[in-house]
From Swiss-Prot:
Membrane topology, as annotated: Multi-pass membrane protein
Cross-referenced InterPro entries: BP-dep_ABC_trans_perm, MetI-like, MetI-like_sf
Residue pairs linked by disulfide bridges in the UniProt entry: none
Subcellular location: Cell membrane
GO CC, alphabetical: ATP-binding cassette (ABC) transporter complex
Function: Part of the ABC transporter complex MalEFGK involved in trehalose/maltose import. Responsible for the translocation of the substrate across the membrane.
Keyword Iron-sulfur: no
Homology family: Belongs to the binding-protein-dependent transport system permease family.
Protein name as annotated: Trehalose/maltose transport system permease protein MalG
Keywords: Cell membrane, Membrane, Sugar transport, Transmembrane, Transmembrane helix, Transport
Domain of life: Archaea
GO annotation (BP), single: transmembrane transport
Span of domain ABC transmembrane type-1: 70-262
Length: 278
């Protein structure tokens, strides 16, 4: 009995410590974003005073272009998510449900391509994008992002689809349903948790991507939030930590809230495919 109580106490302490470690960066980011004078970070003599000035500046200062960065990130990430999940759903269904020669090599090939680091592809991609005249356009980020997020999406959905009984497909085809109709009316509704978790992970990955956005965009017309925040500068070239943190809060907190609200579906979508019979 004492051992069980001790284990329970240790688990609770571990969970609390983990929560503190995970939440501390966000809490600190919020604290600094409301600071009137961020120099309190390095001097105990500077009093902490809260203000909304940093948020007002980020949203209204025309030199920062933050609303444009946020719009670009949302549009690109949304398009990438829609495309990636759609393509990976079709591919995962074909590999998991249709017998054809070499089908098992497809996920291995896709996974192998994803093992190449981004930096090794940047030079070739930039030359290709430059020849197409896509530098500083949505296309310059859209297509690389789709290729970059497709392996993750395919593997998650493939592991989930593989656990669904094939009797469902056979019953649907006996009733005269085509493969596409079977996918859209039976498989996808049953795979809602996996689809949702995949879509959220793809959206976050595309929203937070930095390297391609830094190299393939030149100004606010196509630049995304991570690069835009990294390039924030004050009047004299200093880093405006208050504005940086305010912009980070605006762009990060909605994603965190969304992940917390739908964590049940995310966890079930990521784990169900790994459990036999799920």
């Amino acid at each position: 009995m004492r051992e069980e109580v001790l284990k329970r106490i240790l688990l609770i302490i571990g969970a609390i410590l983990m929560a503190i470690i995970c939440l501390f960066p966000f809490i600190w980011m919020i604290v600094v974003s409301f600071a009137e004078d961020p120099t309190f970070l390095g001097s105990p003599l500077v009093e902490y005073k809260s203000t909304l000035e940093n948020y007002v500046r980020v949203l209204s200062d025309p030199t920062l272009h933050f609303p444009a960065y946020l719009k670009n990130s949302i549009i690109i990430a949304s398009l990438v998510t829609l495309t990636t999940v759609s393509i990976s759903s079709l591919a995962a269904y074909a590999v998991s449900r249709i017998e054809f020669k070499g089908r098992l090599l497809i996920p291995i090939f896709v996974l192998g391509l994803s093992m190449f680091p981004q930096i090794s592809l940047v030079g070739y991609l930039f030359k290709f994008i430059e020849k197409l005249g896509w530098v500083n356009t949505y296309q310059a980020l859209y297509f690389p992002y789709v290729a970059w997020t497709l392996p993750l999406s395919l593997w998650i959905l493939l592991s989930y689809f593989s656990q669904l009984p094939k009797d469902l497909d056979e019953a649907a085809m006996i009733d005269g349903a085509s493969r596409i109709k079977t996918l859209t009316t039976i498989i996808l509704p049953l795979s809602a948790p996996a689809l949702f978790s995949t879509a959220l992970l793809v959206f976050i990955a595309a929203f937070n991507e930095f390297m391609f956005a830094l190299l393939f965009t030149t100004d606010h017309r196509a630049r995304t939030v991570p690069v835009g925040i990294a390039l924030f500068q004050g009047v004299h070239g200093e880093i405006p930590w208050g504005s940086v943190m305010a912009a980070s809060v605006i762009s990060t907190i909605p994603l965190v809230i969304m992940a917390l609200l739908f964590q049940k579906y995310i966890v079930s979508g990521l784990t169900a495919g790994a459990l036999k019979g799920e």
